[in-house]
Amino acid sequence: MSMVWMLFPIYCLFTNMSRVWFLADTHFGLKNDKDMWLDDFTNYFNDVVIPLMRKEYRDGDILVHLGDVFDNRSVIGIRTICETIDIFEKFSEIFKDIRIIVGNHDIYNKSSNDVTSIKMLERIPNVTVYKKPSVEVIDGKTILFNPWVNELESEKKLLESVNADYIFGHLDVSGCQLNKSGSKSMSENSIDSKNFKNSIVYAGHIHKRQDYKNVHYVGTPYQMTRNEMGDINGITVLDVASGETTFFENKYSPRFKKVSIYEILNKTVGELKEDWKNYFVDLHIKGSDYIVCKFDTLTEELMNYFKEFNIHSENNDDIIDTSSTENGVEKKSAEEYVDDWLNDNDIDENRMKVIKELYSKYKEKI
């Protein structure tokens, strides 16, 4: 695989910038373009982020998206395309300078960044898309804009050739925490933080907001899977000259929440509605207790106020089937539960394909 261009980043000169507003891993079109998720994402931007940007914008501020604008690498729904373009057009009305760094979910071929879904955003005024590395001097600081690179050795050579104050990129840094389970990024394409030398790094790719040595993952704007339960999400703004950051926490979007039977029993229905509205609520309970407590009526009531209400067995963590036409809970097929599990555990596409093939194979034998 030849990626010689990685050794020769483009150098440009820019000045008079105030701050950088970071976005990363927006994943528009999540879960096969499901309307509920797209509505949640676009509502957050239209109701919270864009008004915030209009209020807090300072002359010279730029907007940098650190990759994975979209979720699906090959198929994007028409509504997702229209909504995403609409949001970036609104960004363009605020910012005179918008940079989008290509992420691994934004490219069709894993070995090349040339075919990218971000191409549809290039014609929006003030938007620059980075498919190749670019070094720019802003307010006296040297900044490397580094898109996704699928070849570790090429990336190491690139970093060795550049002495940057800041690196903005879509990066897989070894040792960073992937999610609340504590598992670390250790893939064969992970790059060691020492390769960044003394550069301060702001990155997308890993969804959990965190600081690791000189690397700062800005995290997703909102929660997308149960693995992100408990994460603090929002928007990070960097003052390049001083190095200081401001964080605007997202207190608007739905969150995942795990609760016990005791938390349910100690609250009134009114308190449950108020405290957990707009949540994906997972109730963990023993199967025998579920039968005794007769949750059907409560489930029917709460489904009108929660984004989702699932009951899990404490013994094996399986979802207890509460589906029926009477209680208003959406009935899911076994295939849908498998898809939900794969999405919640952020399985890569190759492994996902193998798991689905194995499921189909053994399902026929049951």
Model-predicted segments: where are they?
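Core catalytic region of metal-dependent phosphoesterases/phosphodiesterases
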Residues: 18-19, 26, 30-135, 194-198
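Divalent metal-coordination and catalytic microenvironments
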Residues: 25, 68, 84, 103, ...
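Active-site environment of divalent metal-dependent phosphoester hydrolases
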Residues: 29-31, 71-74, 101-111, 151-153, ...
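Accessory, non-catalytic peripheral segments of nucleic-acid enzymes
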Residues: 58, 240-366
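Conserved catalytic scaffold of divalent metal-dependent phosphoesterases
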Residues: 84, 106-192, 218-221
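Conserved beta-sheet core of the metallophosphoesterase superfamily
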Residues: 179-245
